[in-house]
Amino acid sequence: MSVDKAELCGSLLTWLQTFHVPSPCASPQDLSSGLAVAYVLNQIDPSWFNEAWLQGISEDPGPNWKLKVSNLKMVLRSLVEYSQDVLAHPVSEEHLPDVSLIGEFSDPAELGKLLQLVLGCAISCEKKQDHIQRIMTLEESVQHVVMEAIQELMTKDTPDSLSPETYGNFDSQSRRYYFLSEEAEEGDELQQRCLDLERQLMLLSEEKQSLAQENAGLRERMGRPEGEGTPGLTAKKLLLLQSQLEQLQEENFRLESGREDERLRCAELEREVAELQHRNQALTSLAQEAQALKDEMDELRQSSERAGQLEATLTSCRRRLGELRELRRQVRQLEERNAGHAERTRQLEDELRRAGSLRAQLEAQRRQVQELQGQRQEEAMKAEKWLFECRNLEEKYESVTKEKERLLAERDSLREANEELRCAQLQPRGLTQADPSLDPTSTPVDNLAAEILPAELRETLLRLQLENKRLCRQEAADRERQEELQRHLEDANRARHGLETQHRLNQQQLSELRAQVEDLQKALQEQGGKTEDAISILLKRKLEEHLQKLHEADLELQRKREYIEELEPPTDSSTARRIEELQHNLQKKDADLRAMEERYRRYVDKARMVMQTMEPKQRPAAGAPPELHSLRTQLRERDVRIRHLEMDFEKSRSQREQEEKLLISAWYNMGMALQQRAGEERAPAHAQSFLAQQRLATNSRRGPLGRLASLNLRPTDKH
């Protein structure tokens, strides 16, 4: 019977609101974007519908129906993949909704199909009990519609989900494991079913008794004559009672036939219960035997582990004895080195005492040398100052001499010009008389002749006079500026010369100090004493370094002695006997069934001991630089050994896992064969009714299919 998709959409909307998603989901229009459905799927299975998948859904598509269709396609694709890959429930074509109608028109029928797929994922996931409890809290009408949708989905998915091709590749080991677990569950279900049928039979018998009593009462009433009432009313009552009697007789007959069927069914169920109990006893005995074998294997494994631990302890003790001998040798070397350092320290102290007696004399001589150097530097500065003044005076003298020569040359040129002018004075006399402005000594009466000169000549003469005055003023200003620059140049030269003098004096002083230092060193070497301050500082530094090394050597020696005391093996005779007994037990464990596991444990313990022996040798390596190279070499060798041990461990572990898988698979196959043989022996040889044959065929088909379904729902319980 198909469910109305519109009604289903409304009921599933009510169910969807119980998830409390951030997106609204009260109407089909709210679900047309696909965002609310995506949030619900994220709550159903966060591992599959994770946050990365949720971010791929567009959060606000708005009125754009194409974005809504894109979101719905992504949600539908993920739903189908989840059903096929995780739940192993392939979705048929008739259950796939048309997402374009949902995104564009919010079609309730197509939306109901989509929500029906979401419901199927919810009741088939790992949290299905929580979702079923959530459905039970809804209204009764909503529960009825939801249950019809689940039944429709399961009835249409059962043929596909229970096909042999889907479950043909399961491991026989897991199949046998779940088959054993289903046997006990089927026995409990059949027992509960028998109890329910007995309870129904009791209720039907009580109901039959009550109906018989009521029938007897009605017959008594019919037999009594009624004094009151009309005959028509009596006839009507009689007809009514007869009809009720016929109905009750029919109901009684139906109940009798149903009781007979239930009795037959109960007998068949009792036979099935007896068979299942017999099978349960056989399986219980097999389980007890398997548990006993498992306990024996655990004991053997513990003994092999104990043997490996004892062997590792023995190996570590031997290694520690070798290390103890090596540490004793190192302690002897450190003691010899410590004695050498102590002798060197005493020698340095004697040299320091001899050098202290000459330090005061050296300080007095150094102060005198510094005073003499200061006086010499002052005198040198004065001499340089007078030398610079002398050079300046010489430069001034040279400049004055050059100026004198220039003035003499200018005087000669002026004399020649004056003579030439005197020679030519006779010719322009008339010009001078005509223009009295050219002759400053002429009287105003003589200037009357100047009017005879043309106007252009007079303007030219005036312009030349003004130009001459301007040039004279400019020459005076340039001369003042040149004098000022000359003064600045002299100041700069004086400062530069002073700096050069200071530099030269410093260089000379430095060379003198170096020469003095060399002389003093030579003198001290000749005298055989080391009284210089630098040498005393060097001796102090060397003494401090030797004292520090001596202190470090003492600390190192003390640490190694403590470590030797810790590594010192006990001399108890019982411990020696115990070690011999353990060695004897180790030789007896060579033929154990768990040899590979023992080898694995031994390698792990050896690697741990190597790491533990590396740590105490890394700490004293800081105080013993000569042994650093050997320790590093040992560390590299142990790293290589650890890598080899890890590779061997990986190989042994993989081989051990394969052996366990083969052993368990063979065990389960043997149990399956024994059970099949027992079922064939218990099969009834006499003829059965048609109904019994059909029930046996149904149960035989239901058993493997039910086990396959349980294997499908729980494929990872072993892990």
Swiss-Prot record:
Protein name: Protein Hook homolog 2
Superkingdom of source: Eukaryota
Residue span of region Disordered: 696-719
SUPFAM superfamilies, sorted: Hook domain (SSF116907)
PANTHER family, sorted: HOOK PROTEINS, PROTEIN HOOK HOMOLOG 2
UniProt domain Calponin-homology (CH): residue ranges: 6-122
Subcellular location per the Swiss-Prot or TrEMBL entry: Cytoplasm, Cytoskeleton, Microtubule organizing center, Centrosome; Cytoplasm; Cytoplasm, Cytoskeleton; Golgi apparatus, trans-Golgi network
Modified residues (Phosphothreonine): 230
Keywords assigned by UniProt, alphabetized: Coiled coil, Cytoplasm, Cytoskeleton, Golgi apparatus, Microtubule, Phosphoprotein, Protein transport, Transport
Provenance organism: Homo sapiens
Subunit structure: Self-associates. Component of the FTS/Hook/FHIP complex (FHF complex), composed of AKTIP/FTS, FHIP1B, and one or more members of the Hook family of proteins HOOK1, HOOK2, and HOOK3. May interact directly with AKTIP/FTS, HOOK1 and HOOK3. Associates with several subunits of the homotypic vesicular sorting complex (the HOPS complex) including VPS16 and VPS41; these interactions may be indirect. Interacts with CNTRL. Interacts with microtubules. Interacts with ZC3H14. Interacts with LRGUK (via guanylate kinase-like domain). Interacts with CCDC181.
Any one annotated GO CC term: intracellular membrane-bounded organelle
